[in-house]
Amino acid sequence: METTQTLRFKTKALAVLSKCYDHAQTHLKGGVLQVNLLSVNYGGPRLAAVANAGTAGLISFEVSPDAVAEWQNHQSPEEAPAAVSFRNLAYGRTCVLGKELFGSAVEQASLQFYKRPQGGSRPEFVKLTMEYDDKVSKSHHTCALMPYMPPASDRLRNEQMIGQVLLMPKTASSLQKWARQQGSGGVKVTLNPDLYVTTYTSGEACLTLDYKPLSVGPYEAFTGPVAKAQDVGAVEAHVVCSVAADSLAAALSLCRIPAVSVPILRFYRSGIIAVVAGLLTSAGDLPLDLSVILFNHASEEAAASTASEPEDKSPRVQPLGTGLQQRPRHTVSPSPSPPPPPRTPTWESPARPETPSPAIPSHSSNTALERPLAVQLARKRTSSEARQKQKHPKKVKQAFNPLI
């Protein structure tokens, strides 16, 4: 095997970012670790954790060159690749390389890229070596490199930025909650420099956020740490963008780290929005560039809206007489009148003599009325005698005894 590049990190600089990495670990776990070799001309190589954010978003958790202690390139500049990438989740989905690399117990960490002698000029494998602070434990992680992926941080290098808007934590939280309610649909974002507002629209739902304008241009704003988090912006032109709602919610959540950073929205003329983590002054000088690129979601939203529109199956109204054909005169003949319906014979049944109802004898009715009355009197008499016995109990008569 031939070694192509060697990279050794400052473990203390990586340990400072352990809180930030844990905040974004849920999204970064399924992504890749990438070493940007193009940035050697801009200060040194950069290590980045790259992953997807929702439907149309790309996360870049990039470490500045200040965290690199030593860099050696054993290839010529023409043979060296622009970037090398390998999976963050390795060893049967049981070991997360990024979590181990940004851990606080690591004493030394290095990356070694190498290739087979007959494999060409591009590196094929990577070996991650870590030594821990107990001076005994040591781990090696070896895996194959992934196919070439362009550096995530260079995607917006040639884009023209026309506005930046900083959101305070309370405003970012309300916007994140609103974006989560919209699901994975498209959100139309309008930046208005005349009214100093940003409007977010998804279907019938709409949210308007205002900001305080700054007197500087977009490239001069927010170049250093943020001293005070407030809703301010530097905008020079009107722009309309379309992003995915779930990607917007994920970007706001990732870039809003408590006591570390607040989200900054960067608008580009091509319709792309980049949500960047603006580091606070209280967080200190962290070697971190965290950003989420929100790509244009207009085409996907239009396709979804076209597919969701129901087809109009109701018949169209046509002008009177359309589709009727006039019959020629020589074929028109008067239609015969329908024959009258046959008369049915009617007959009347003879009236039947009414039969008088049998008369009820008078003695039977009197007897039927007298029986219930007698029963009622007997019941009253019995009840009255019972009450008399209860009121006047029977006295026991004593017989005369002559012997007394």
From Swiss-Prot:
- Impact when changing residue 355 to V: Complete loss of phosphorylation
Q: Where is this region: Disordered?
A: 302-404
Report if keyword Cell division is assigned: no
Region Transcriptional activation: start-end pairs: 301-404
Keyword check for Cytoplasm: no
What does the similarity note say? Belongs to the herpesviridae DNA polymerase accessory subunit family.
Instruction: State the oligomer form and interacting partners.
Output: Homodimer. Two dimers can adopt a tetrameric ring-like structure. Forms a complex with the DNA-binding protein BALF2, the DNA polymerase subunit BALF5, and the alkaline exonuclease BGLF5. Interacts (via N-terminus) with BZLF1 (via bZIP domain); this interaction may inhibit BZLF1-induced transcription of the BMRF1 promoter. Interacts (via C-terminus) with host NuRD complex; this interaction is important for transcriptional activation of EBV promoters and inhibition of the ubiquitination step of DDR signaling.
Q: What's the protein called, per UniProt?
A: DNA polymerase processivity factor BMRF1
Which lineage is the organism of this entry classified under, starting from the top rank? Viruses, Duplodnaviria, Heunggongvirae, Peploviricota, Herviviricetes
